[in-house]
Amino acid sequence: MTVLIHVLGSDIPHHNRTVLRFFNHALAATSEHAREFMVVGKDDGLSDSCPALSVQFFPGKKSLAEAVIAKAKANRQQRFFFHGQFNPTLWLALLSGGIKPSQFFWHIWGADLYELSSGLRYKLFYPLRRLAQKRVGCVFATRGDLSFFAKTHPKVRGELLYFPTRMDPSLNTMANDRQREGKMTILVGNSGDRSNEHIAALRAVHQQFGDTVKVVVPMGYPPNNEAYIEEVRQAGLELFSEENLQVLSEKLEFDAYLTLLRQCDLGYFIFARQQGIGTLCLLIQAGIPCVLNRENPFWQDMTEQHLPVLFTTDDLNEDIVREAQRQLASVDKNTIAFFSPNYLQGWQRALAIAAGEVA
């Protein structure tokens, strides 16, 4: 049998590193279909930190796409698992037959599914991408994204799968003995990316709570984002006093980020699509409820796991937030499907499906 090849077709260092390390530590030892990777970006020590994997790096999307297409044409039994598919050339190859549906398996990350960019280039490309998506052999995604995808592509097979968020299961009970009182701290957004709509989110938080809460905005990632960070800071200072606004411009290491999250009482995410599952998982693990946009289908995954969900359209106050905290504290977090290690079973099944080992 031909070994499955995994494709990280865009240079998204943080997520690519998370996926590679997860495969190296959790999957490669038990499956030959979890070892071969083609990745856009620089090695930056990844090969050394992932010795169980064979990783080929490419300088850009186009060079990787050309290599994938060549392999697909040379051997029609070769199957590919695309992790977050942001590479236009690969979509066009699927549409034109350069890659066959039986070769194309896609794990939806969120931004690769929704059509939120307003630029002319994107508006012209989206219809072609929708046509190509009808030809995918199988999609893997959250419950909410599967539901969203099935509305336009009901004939494409869909399987439940969660991004392998870096988590320590021993921390599942860390919030149970914490007392929450006094001024609330609200986390706004999961990164410095504009998709978080930080300014609109700050205005929404201010409309709900006024200048009575402390707002923390993590914007250390992506890099070279100083102008937008300053734009958000100035907009925030028009709404909140300086003591109640903390805009973080430096990237935090994982442990420091965990410490930051534990200081919060609420997460506020205004974006209208599924993203930031990693941050949501870490907040939920710490017993911190989240406010979501009703258009963000991840609420379906949360309610399926009996987790409280607050919406941006709700009338929020401290009593409602504290009640959500109490509800969340009563949930057995060791049973949540999108937590580590529970998502591992889904990955093992996904590998078997993509490799053709199970129907």
Curated annotation (Swiss-Prot):
Pathway(s) where this gene product acts: Bacterial outer membrane biogenesis; enterobacterial common antigen biosynthesis
Cell location: Cell inner membrane
Principal EC category: transferase
Reactions that this protein is recorded to catalyse: beta-D-ManNAcA-(1->4)-alpha-D-GlcNAc-di-trans,octa-cis-undecaprenyl diphosphate + dTDP-4-acetamido-4,6-dideoxy-alpha-D-galactose = alpha-D-FucNAc4-(1->4)-beta-D-ManNAcA-(1->4)-D-GlcNAc-undecaprenyl diphosphate + dTDP + H(+)
Membrane topology according to the record: Peripheral membrane protein
GO biological process terms on file: enterobacterial common antigen biosynthetic process; fucosylation
Function: Catalyzes the synthesis of Und-PP-GlcNAc-ManNAcA-Fuc4NAc (Lipid III), the third lipid-linked intermediate involved in ECA synthesis.
The protein's name: TDP-N-acetylfucosamine:lipid II N-acetylfucosaminyltransferase
Species this chain originates from: Escherichia coli O7:K1 (strain IAI39 / ExPEC)
Gene name tied to this protein: wecF
